[in-house]
């Protein structure tokens, strides 16, 4: 029984280039500048790609907090993370920093972002400014497939 996933092999994208990354989850969307004014067709296709692949990646983007929030608002109202203070002018944006002297990573263990809330958000947006050449991994899992595998 398929409970959510779109048949991504049959999804046609006319305005964006979508490259699946793995069989279970994820795709990279290319040739889109998220800080520019995006028309409804492009936004609709980005949303369809999100529904089809559950995690989407956009490389080489240049976001300021204002443009990041503006892009997020195209898909719903951003929430304020309840446990960590966000930026002063953009409380919906939570900076995550790890210094060389820090022993633990933010989140530290496998977790899901705010899905415990009564009305959880549709997703999480992560904008990496600086990442190490090795390590620093953020991992994702497809809970739809995990649920299907139970039966």
PLM feature spans:
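Non-heme Fe(II) oxygenase catalytic core, chiefly the N-lobe of the double-stranded beta-helix
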Residues: 2-151
